[in-house]
Design a protein with these regions (language model features):
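Outer-membrane beta-barrel "beta-signal"
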Residues: 93, 173-175, 201-213
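Repeated loop/turn-to-beta-strand initiation elements of outer-membrane beta-barrel proteins
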Residues: 25-30, 56-62, 96-101, 144-152, ...
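Residues that define the transmembrane beta-barrel architecture of outer-membrane proteins
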Residues: 26, 42-46, 79-85, 109, ...
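Short glycine/proline- and aromatic-enriched beta-strand/turn motifs that initiate or cap beta-hairpins
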Residues: 19-72, 85, 204, 210-212
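Detector for outer-membrane/organellar transmembrane beta-barrel domains
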Residues: 98-159
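Transmembrane beta-strands of outer-membrane beta-barrel pores
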Residues: 34-38, 64-70, 83, 93, ...
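Outer-membrane beta-barrel architecture
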Residues: 49-51, 88-91, 137-141, 170-172, ...
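Cleavable N-terminal export/targeting peptides
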Residues: 1-27, 213
Length: 213
């Protein structure tokens, strides 16, 4: 968490230090991000995501994420590594030259590898599992004349044969330094319904760098 706060404090002054004007939204990009989470099973998240426009305000979306965590339960120590690949299609609806509504439908393939070691044993147990999730998203974005972009998005998760339900609210603030380079900060709140030991509420905070083309 301290690492994220330091990076955010370094980034915020840059968000307002330039008057570079961005000419509309560009949905052709590749970005790399780092986030932290207060979810019990995930501490750090590294991800790469991208978008390619295919015409008529449609885009192909992709993301690869690796999440890691470790924790102690009574008499045992555990670690987890999640890897997820997301593919989807997005559609934007322009309200004016600086504001648009965003929407997408994505499929997430999710792998979990977990280790468990009891304090009374020298043996480490290894387990793995797979699951898949469908994610529908809708949001709004605005780009100011100074190149500051604000994104607000609602993500609706339907996992495990569409029965498990979770919702997310995500807010991003991004500064475009040129037509090809931007840096952003983000905060996400995950609301699990119904909540369980492996599907609880959590918050993520992060930073990312975007390269447009």
């Amino acid at each position: 968490m301290k690492k994220i706060l330091t990076m955010a404090l370094m980034t915020i002054p840059m968000l307002f230090s330039s008057n570079i004007l961005a000419e509309g939204f560009n949905d052709n990009y590749l970005q790399v991000g780092y986030s932290t989470s207060n979810y019990k099973f995930v501490d750090e998240i590294m991800d790469i995501e991208g978008s390619v426009e295919i015409g008529n305000n449609f885009s192909i979306l992709g993301r690869y994420a690796r999440e890691t965590g470790d924790w102690r339960d009574p008499l045992e120590y555990e670690t987890s590594t999640y890897t997820g690949t997301t593919i989807g299609i997005g559609k934007t609806f322009e309200l004016d030259t600086n504001t648009s509504v965003t929407s997408s439908l994505s499929y997430l393939d999710y792998d979990l590898k977990q280790t468990q070691k009891y304090d009374s044993s020298s043996t480490t147990n290894h387990t793995s599992s797979k699951t898949n999730t469908y994610i529908a998203s809708v949001g709004v974005r605005n780009l100011s004349d100074s190149g500051i972009q604000t994104n607000l998005k609602l993500n609706i998760w339907r996992a495990g044969k569409l029965k498990s339900k979770s919702n997310e609210i995500e807010l991003e603030l991004m500064k475009h330094f040129s037509d090809t380079l931007a840096i952003g900060i983000r905060v996400l709140r995950h609301d699990a319904k119904p909540a369980s030991s492996y599907n609880s509420d959590w918050t993520e905070t992060g930073i990312y760098v975007r390269r447009s083309f």
